[in-house]
Structures are given as C-alpha cells and as structure tokens.
Amino acid sequence: MTPDFDRAVALLRAGELVAFPTETVYGLGADAANPAAVAKIFAAKGRPADHPLIVHICGHDAVDRWAEQVPAFAWELMEAFWPGPLTLILKKQAWVPDAVTGGQETVGLRVPGHPLALELLRQRMTGPTL
C-alpha cells in the first residue's frame, strides 16, 4: 500500500476521521467501536445524534460481533449481495455504542465492494469503520 493508505489506517486507529471510497460514494469513516471517534462524524456532518450510521465491515465473519439473532434470510442476502451496496438492518449486540445506532436496538451493516475500502477495513483490524 501507499504512505497515504498507511496514514489513513493510523488515523483510524488514533480515533480520527478518514474519507474512503465505496462502490457508490465516498464515505467519512471512523472506528465504529470508539464513541469519541463516532461523535466526530456527527460533528463534521452536522448530523442529528438520533440518525444511525452504517457500520462497514470486511466480511461475513464480522456480523456476529455486531449483530445478534441474525435470521437465515439475512445470511442468504449477505451471500448473494456482499460485497456490495446492500445494508442490512439487524438486531445489535448489547455492547454496540448508541452513538452508532442513534439509540436504536438495531445496527446497519454493510460490506463495501470497493477494493480500497475492503483493504482499509482489513488493515484496521481492531474495529470496523462507519
């Protein structure tokens, strides 16, 4: 990877924001497991705190970390459409920060189809991004 890519990974690990491409738009990302980092997204966008964010993950194996009681049809959708522009709204695990979900009992999960976004998620390793 490039020095800019390595810097983006370091910024995410430090609780900062980065812009990253997906297959549809550029997103503003932060460590979704870090409420202080998530708050920076809301501040940067001027987004109301009760509007949930989408958590980008690098694959199916990260779903159970973020969601519980995932129905069989959701796994079928993941298999058919991930990576890609499909966000699944699932029941969140108890530890998922309310800052991410807007205080809701659900979390939106997505595996982006852009190779740079996927590599950024893989390199981040200690947590997904938003």
Which residues fall in each region the model found?
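Active-site-adjacent structural elements in enzyme catalytic cores
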Residues: 1-130
